């Protein structure tokens, strides 16, 4: 069962509602501590004909794992330090994919998380693990002014 819709930003490539080139995904916090999103990639995001570009899959997982930190109660800005992916199946365009992110371990300085992209039949197509670190205090303080650009946007 879905618990809560997370906020979207204005210009983020993945969730920015005002980004004309963005994917405009919505993220939802689940009862099992995960964050999920769905996405059907149009042909413009293909690498090979009919196949989602691997860089788009990477961006989807990066964002979803990072958002799992918000689900876990981390109220600070974080950035990706390391992200590893395993591409297990061809990911087609034009079908609804499910993207899931979870926190594995959290500390004062950062967190590790895992993510996956599943095909419509539930088959695991891509899996990822990532290390995310807290922004240094000076950078974090300057980012606080950008919080008004994040809001919960209706579906």
Regions found by a protein language model. Give the residues of each.
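Short solvent-exposed loop/turn micro-motifs enriched in small/polar/acidic residues
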Residues: 19-21, 96, 108-110
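Hydrophobic beta-strand-centered segment that forms part of the acyl-chain substrate-binding groove
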Residues: 64-98
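Non-catalytic linker/capping segments at the edges of enzyme domains
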Residues: 1-44, 148-155
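A structural signal for short, well-ordered beta-strand segments
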Residues: 37, 83-87, 101, 115, ...
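HotDog/MaoC-like acyl-thioester-processing domains
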Residues: 1-4, 92-93, 104-155
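A conserved, well-ordered hydrophobic junction motif at loop->secondary-structure transitions
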Residues: 36, 41-60
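Hydrophobic core residues within well-ordered beta-strands of beta-rich domains
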Residues: 33, 79-81, 97, 111, ...
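Short beta-strand micro-motifs enriched in acidic
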Residues: 28-30, 102-106
């Amino acid at each position: 069962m879905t618990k809560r819709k997370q906020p979207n930003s204005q210009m983020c490539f993945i969730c920015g509602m005002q980004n004309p080139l963005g994917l405009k995904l919505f993220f939802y916090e689940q009862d099992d501590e995960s964050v999920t999103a769905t996405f059907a990639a149009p042909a413009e995001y293909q690498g090979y004909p009919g196949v989602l570009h691997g860089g788009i899959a990477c961006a989807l997982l990066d964002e979803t794992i990072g958002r799992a930190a918000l689900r876990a109660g981390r109220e600070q800005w974080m950035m990706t330090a390391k992200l590893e992916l395993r591409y297990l199946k061809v990911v087609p365009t034009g079908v609804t994919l499910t993207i899931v992110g979870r926190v594995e371990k959290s500390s004062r300085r950062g967190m590790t998380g895992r993510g996956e992209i599943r095909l419509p039949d539930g088959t695991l197509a891509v899996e990822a693990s990532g290390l995310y670190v807290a922004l240094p205090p000076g950078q974090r303080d300057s980012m606080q002014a950008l919080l008004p650009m994040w809001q919960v946007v209706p579906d």
